[in-house]
Amino acid sequence: MPEPVAEPALNGLRLNLRIVSIVMFNFASYLTIGLPLAVLPGYVHDVMGFSAFWAGLVISLQYFATLLSRPHAGRYADLLGPKKIVVFGLCGCFLSGLGYLTAGLTASLPVISLLLLCLGRVILGIGQSFAGTGSTLWGVGVVGSLHIGRVISWNGIVTYGAMAMGAPLGVVFYHWGGLQALALIIMGVALVAILLAIPRPTVKASKGKPLPFRAVLGRVWLYGMALALASAGFGVIATFITLFYDAKGWDGAAFALTLFSCAFVGTRLLFPNGINRIGGLNVAMICFSVEIIGLLLVGVATMPWMAKIGVLLAGAGFSLVFPALGVVAVKAVPQQNQGAALATYTVFMDLSLGVTGPLAGLVMSWAGVPVIYLAAAGLVAIALLLTWRLKKRPPVEIPEAASSS
């Protein structure tokens, strides 16, 4: 975790501008993820002639690589400082574009082309975990740990913005110049971000002996479990809301997803200081309550407007869960371990979103689509109870010896 430089208090606008000047590098990394997202499955299946399994695998490889590399990203951010980790991650994003470019140039050799695509996706996953984790810690180093919740919130906003922009733009670039043109755009985005990041001042890494991974996991896993349980609500809406609307015979599933995204981003923009004012655990419990109401409304909806209100509430409720619990999780370890803590905490959300789809699919095939929203509400209720117990637990003293050694 970087050592923040002591400075006079910043007003809200200047504070946000400083944060955005750093998290824009995460925006760039997620833009390189969003640009090919709507293109590659169709390219692998329809153009290259491979099965739907391979089309899905090409996309999934990035998420597996992100999941496996995220703990290493946090550890190296603590050891080397976040700026180096961000630049390393952006280089991975650049190399992923190079992989797509060479895959397009070797289209006459389908197996080679597919392997190059897969390699590019793996490199992108590693790059994203390093750029995402590093940009959060870099932002905290610039504005101070008091504002870690705001930094995490802004990182989420730029993530959603980049993904929302990237997918349609990627389709436009692909229709304009094929996979090679799309690859060059991705390489250009990453290269511009690298050139902007390199001249920026470096934030010093914290001194001190780092805790082993097992010790970090032991301090953050309960917060991670609450996050994982709450993420099930997001997972079932993002994955199955279209099937839910089809089962009901309604139109407007895409608009429901738009409502979720607007509520998610809007809540983060409307309540930037909520975590600092009333505490991360209090914010999390309020968010869980709102998310539960939203999921229950979707599950029992008999009219489209009920489902839309439910999705809106679920998006607003889930919005601040990650930063609210993340602030408390990161502060549960010494400063020199906070990068590893943030990365480890994030893994719980990655795992949750990975297993929610297939598990909810099994429940849906057995009991129907609406039941998965009621089940997700039950999981969020467990997260609420867990967070309430964490709030009642006496605070754990963080040993200073480790941070001053």
From Swiss-Prot:
UniProt-recorded Gene Ontology molecular function terms: transmembrane transporter activity
CDD domains (UniProt xref): MFS_YfcJ_like
Residues spanning the membrane: 19-39, 47-67, 85-105, 107-127, 156-176, 178-198, 224-244, 252-272, 283-303, 309-329, 344-364, 366-386
Record-linked InterPro entries: MFS, MFS_dom, MFS_trans_sf, MFS_Transporters, MFS_YhhS-like
Keyword Transport part of the UniProt annotation: yes
Subcellular location: Cell inner membrane
HAMAP family hit by this protein: MFS_YhhS
Family label: Belongs to the major facilitator superfamily. YhhS family.
Name this polypeptide is given: Uncharacterized MFS-type transporter YhhS
Organism expressing this protein natively: Escherichia coli O6:H1 (strain CFT073 / ATCC 700928 / UPEC)
